[in-house]
Amino acid sequence: KAIKDMARDAKTAFMPQCGLAPGFIGIVAHHLAKGFDSVQDVQMRVGALPAFPTNSLKYNLTWSVDGLINEYCHPCEAIHGGESISALPLEGLEHFSLDGVEYEAFNTSGGLGTLCETWAGQVRSLDYKTVRYPGHRDLMQFLLGDLGLAADQENLKAIMRKSMPTTMQDVVLVFVTVSGQKNGMLLQEVFA
């Protein structure tokens, strides 16, 4: 919202939310949704994971530490029951497997960009969750909640930069599930 206010009278173009999430994930969701007569539910799941995790968090730095901590510490926009809500980060835990590999997914902030505003009044549910290897979420809850590092994010960032290796050998998972009405039938389409 602050960016929209700054851009309102600007003389230059600024195109935010053009990454993986937000960005690509929203394009995929829109592409799937346009094939329906009416959309009911949109679920988006994205994970950028190390191909070869070697620590208890089962995570290596694959992008910005600042962005990582930000998405774990701030409220998450979503739509449930047709109403815009603020969901807690690290909540809404799900488990699934793909090609024999186990994963977990949980609420994180920012991945929807402006989709809650775009689809307000048009969908029953819309949410975004980050995908990680099992156990990651519980350890992050311990660090952020039990140890209080959510209130000391700069220290947590320093610890992660010092202790967690960066890798370019990553795996990106993208799942988008859209369900709704098409030709009088309730259907579901998935991008994976």
List the predicted regions and their residue ranges.
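Short gly/pro/ser/thr-enriched loop/turn and capping motifs at secondary-structure boundaries
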Residues: 1, 21-24, 47-52
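Rossmann-fold NAD(P)-binding glycine/threonine-rich loop
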Residues: 1-14
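Short, conserved acidic/polar surface loops in the N-terminal third of protein domains
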Residues: 2-4, 26-28, 54-56
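Secondary-structure boundary motif
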Residues: 9, 34-35
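General beta-strand structural signal in soluble alpha/beta enzymes
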Residues: 14-16, 44
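Short alpha-helices
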Residues: 18-28, 33
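C-terminal catalytic/substrate-binding lobe primarily of soluble NAD(P)-dependent oxidoreductases
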Residues: 35-192
